[in-house]
């Protein structure tokens, strides 16, 4: 079986145990030599003779799928599958799998690290100290504040656990929320609008789909508390970035941290 392997962390020389397992399964592996997500025009010649595809963050469009007559399965190396044209894969009878929860601890911990960095203004104070300014700023104490978690899946639960350790009040919104889990762990269940209005910190852990695209829009932002900290550790398209920019400009937010942006090539830092 010939398999294309494109995730950058699964390339030779990275010491990946997962790659060793894959090598034991197939001796005909094709690797991503560009060390970045591949475009559709780069994927097609690599995939055309492959039976399997372990996919990173490549653009797996209808054009790619239709050009691959031998492809039998697409396995996403990660939880998200928004870069895969699911309808095209289904039409061609190609199953698409993912690995939910594979990096839940890492992303949940990163989310809380970002919350701490923003609440205590660590990047700002680091820069000011390096510039010889020695600004005195205590930031915001998290104890007793309310964190609203949108998406209480594997990652959201890690973030909630971290927040509980800081004695924060934890509330959550999820269309498929596990009420028994919330009751056991002291997590308040809220509707979307309620969470937006009540939270001092909002953490996004949602998949990107039609129902979540621009979920955080101008109306949602207008209903947030002044100075809300918004952390997006899911997908860029969940936030209307133009509306978020305006909110920052008008000082409605304390900070928006976007770990994922809609179009990376268009971002200016």
Region spans (language model):
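Rossmann-like adenosine-cofactor binding region
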Residues: 62-65, 175-269
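C-terminal helix-to-coil terminal segments
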Residues: 2, 13-18, 90, 97-109, ...
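N-terminal glycine-/charge-rich "phosphate-binding" loop or analogous flexible N-terminal tail
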Residues: 1-50, 264
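Short beta->alpha connector loops at strand-helix junctions that form conserved
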Residues: 33, 77-78, 94-105, 174, ...
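Phosphate-binding beta-alpha-beta segment of Rossmann-like dinucleotide-binding domains, i.e.
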Residues: 92-94, 99-146, 150, 161, ...
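Hydrophobic/small residue at the entry helix of a nucleotide-binding pocket
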Residues: 155
